Amino acid sequence: MSSFANLFGKSTKVDENIEQLFKNTRDGPVSKDELVKKQRTVIKIPKVTAPKQQTNENESTLNQSANESDEEEEEYNDESNEGDDSDDAEQTEPTSKNDDENENLEAQYFDKLLSEQNEEQDESKESSEAKSSKVAEERTKAKVATTVDLKEKELEKADRTVFVGNVPADVITSKIIAKNFKNLFKHYGKIDSIRYRSISFDEHLPRKVAFAKKNLHKSRDSVNAYIVYKEKPASIAAKELNATVFEDHHLRVDHVSHPAPKDNKRTIFVGNLDFEEKEETLWKYFNSKLDQDVESVRIIRDSKTNLGKGFALVQFKDTLSVNKALLLNDKPLETGTQKKGRKLRISRAKSNAKPSLMSPNHFDNQKKKFAAGKSQQKLNDNQKTKIGRAQSTLGKADRSTVGKAKRIILEGQRATKGEAIKGIKGSKKGKKVKKPRIRERSTKFKEERKTMNKV
């Protein structure tokens, strides 16, 4: 026994350790009184008043929650009555901000749903009313009558028009020269109108004001003219006046809608010209060197300044003249007895070199763009040919509007002189119009009469 007792130690030491565990009163047994003193934690659930627009299901759920809250309150009151008298008074717990905000969450949610439904219904009503009003307006409004602008009048006018280049500028300033110029072309038929273009002025003024003042630029002694005949055969016959001399100027005459064919085999390119070079000097120079074989001379000019770009195209009557003209390359231009410092650069004329197809300014790309805009319209073959003719013959203003839709304007009967018009005074026949009295003359007469009476 002694050996086993030595293994586990003395019993007195074990008892001492157990006594140390239960020395503290807090570690001892808990009495019932202490348990009763501790209050039970209860969460108060506020009563929620249901809105009037809630459904029956929502009302039932709210009633159940209210009954459950009432039962919990009754249990809490029973337990509080069983406690001490000092703890009978209910301790009010402080309410947090979140509880105040979340009191009516459910009611707010249903109110929001109902308001959204009402807004959707109002929007649908407004959209339906707007659609119905638009349909009614479309029915009441009459569609505007439109037609495709084919420029038929301008094309018919172009068939009777002749272009005249290198016209002396004195035609604008002198009435005698203008009359002689008109008589020259009047020999082939009656003239409807004459328009002068490519006029360069000396001052930077509006063109109408500058034309009225007739302050022309001194370095530019020629203009272009468009002569409109009353009949087409007369305009075609007037092409015979090409290369005729009028006031020491060789005229370049060509038809607008039926121009003369361009032959590159009979044409030369002349470069390194002065910007203020005149067409008449080239006429005289090449006629003197090539036995009067020049058919036409054209200096390419800037559309805004009317100054030359430094090169020209000269067309001859015979192809042999081209070979002779090439011998004049790198030789100065002679004007009478004087020689200019610039040496001419003469070469054979080539076909129009087209720019890159990637460029939007390429003629084919512009043509495709124009065709794409017109493809939306349903045009027949006759209309397409007219649009193509207008694009090739008419000017910039007409080319920009050809093929577009235009409104049809209905006009009534035009008024004539002496016709009676309702609502306008003094429109009856035979009634003279009263002239206004001259006040100065009458006042002078009265003053003279007064002086006569005084005397």
Curated annotation (Swiss-Prot):
InterPro entries: Nucleotide-bd_a/b_plait_sf (IPR012677), RBD_domain_sf (IPR035979), RRM_dom (IPR000504). GO terms for cellular component: nucleolus; preribosome. It comes from the Eukaryota. Residues 51-66, 349-363 have a biased composition (Polar residues). GO terms for biological process: maturation of LSU-rRNA from tricistronic rRNA transcript (SSU-rRNA, 5.8S rRNA, LSU-rRNA). It comes from Candida albicans (strain SC5314 / ATCC MYA-2876). Residues 339-348, 425-438 have a biased composition (Basic residues). Its main location: nucleus. Residues 24-37, 124-141, 439-455 have a biased composition (Basic and acidic residues). This is Nucleolar protein 12. It is found in: Nucleus, Nucleolus. Residues 1-104, 117-142, 333-402, 420-455 are annotated as: Disordered. Belongs to the RRM RBM34 family. Residues 68-91 have a biased composition (Acidic residues). One of its GO terms (molecular function) is rRNA binding. Keywords: Nucleus, Repeat, Ribosome biogenesis, RNA-binding, rRNA processing. It holds the Pfam family RRM_1. Involved in pre-25S rRNA processing. Residues 160-258, 266-351 form the RRM domain. The gene is NOP12.
